[in-house]
């Protein structure tokens, strides 16, 4: 287990910066793009919240949920319909945009409309996909597979940087623990930073997912999102990934682990307070 790499750099997605010693930034949005109107509604609300809190925010949503538990699960708007919406969110709202890619052939086209290409956890070792994403020059956010140790991600990141792209983020989203269960080992956060040399993101919503736990869909325990998010920020991360939705109980995917949009601002405000304390050079002792 090699843990000797250079200090984590700062990676910028548009105007939003991610760094282990920089103020916390957020990646947030609904699980999948349900419609143009829905995406713009949520993105607009998140932009207003980010402005009030003075925090960097990257908007995320998926054009295709290609790994749904069941073939009957809704997958999203689709690539061709989603691309102009991604571009519109970036141009009209000024938010950097993140979406995931599943095939190497998608990367060039998607990169024309977004700022960050995300590699899903299940695909994090697919070399051709990683190299295609790297070749776009966009920021690449690669999620740690639920089946990998944190130090295994050094080889994953090396594929991207070896492809000539230093702009890499690494996301922790839990580790498989028995059937239909994930656990979050907070030790993985500093290990990821140390072994990959990349800014580390904590995915607070997928970490409480129960994969396949509802038979034809995944379950989740959204009540633990704030708990794990606070723990991760206290340990020290560059950013937190939070899926949010105006009505998660009726969302087409990942509803059980998404944060209701009405609760998002209070959660992020609390995380910012934890982040300020965790990154303070000399925290004042309580009087």
From Swiss-Prot:
- The primary location reported for this protein is cytoplasm
Q: Where in the cell is it found?
A: Cytoplasm
Top-level taxon of the source organism: Bacteria
Keyword Transferase present in the record's keywords: the answer is: yes
Please name the GO terms of the biological process aspect recorded for this protein, alphabetically: keto-3-deoxy-D-manno-octulosonic acid biosynthetic process
Q: Report the GO molecular function annotations.
A: 3-deoxy-8-phosphooctulonate synthase activity
Q: Which UniProt keywords apply?
A: Cytoplasm, Lipopolysaccharide biosynthesis, Transferase
Q: Which Pfam families match?
A: DAHP_synth_1
Q: Among the entry's GO cellular component annotations, what is one?
A: cytoplasm
Q: Which InterPro entries match?
A: Aldolase_TIM (IPR013785), DAHP1/KDSA (IPR006218), KDO8P_synthase (IPR006269)
* EC code: 2.5.1.55
Against HAMAP family, the record matches this protein to: KDO8P_synth
Of which family is this protein a member? Belongs to the KdsA family.
Q: What is this protein called?
A: 2-dehydro-3-deoxyphosphooctonate aldolase
What organism is this sequence from?
Answer: Nitrobacter hamburgensis (strain DSM 10229 / NCIMB 13809 / X14)
The gene name reads kdsA
